[in-house]
Amino acid sequence: MISGLSHITLIVKDLNKTTTFLREIFNAEEIYSSGDQTFSLSKEKFFLIAGLWICIMEGDSLQEQTYNHIAFRIQSEEVDEYIERIKSLGVEIKPERPRVEGEGRSIYFYDFDNHLFELHAGTLEERLKRYHE
């Protein structure tokens, strides 16, 4: 029986650059670094973001950008603060897309390896309520 999400692994070219990205934007807590050892496919680091285990492993970047993404929930009053955090790292923020009223704002941005992230100021319940009106 599935009891929840275990972890998410992202393959990245530069572990240190991605560490800065995760810490500065998501307040990620680094809980493990393999250093020069390899226990899995390559060098790796583990982080906690809001209790979620995120693993980054050294490897080739994604060749292209897609809409596949990981979304984290933030509060609506934090949107502008997060936009500034993201911009401070030189990361491009995608233009906001049109939203259904009541859906909540989102910030979409790619990391240095073409992984798309979303910071969303809304909940599933709010979205479903709006869609059923």
Swiss-Prot record:
Domain VOC: 4-122
Needed cofactors: Mn(2+)
Assigned GO CC terms: cytoplasm
Gene Ontology BP, a term: response to antibiotic
GO molecular function: metal ion binding
One Pfam family, short name: Glyoxalase
Gene3D superfamilies: 2,3-Dihydroxybiphenyl 1,2-Dioxygenase, domain 1
Keywords assigned: Antibiotic resistance, Cytoplasm, Manganese, Metal-binding
Binding site for Mn(2+): H7, H69, E118
Chief location: cytoplasm
Active-site residue list: E44 (proton acceptor)
Cited function: Catalyzes the hydration of fosfomycin.
Subunit structure: Homodimer.
Name the UniProt record assigns to this protein: Fosfomycin resistance protein FosX
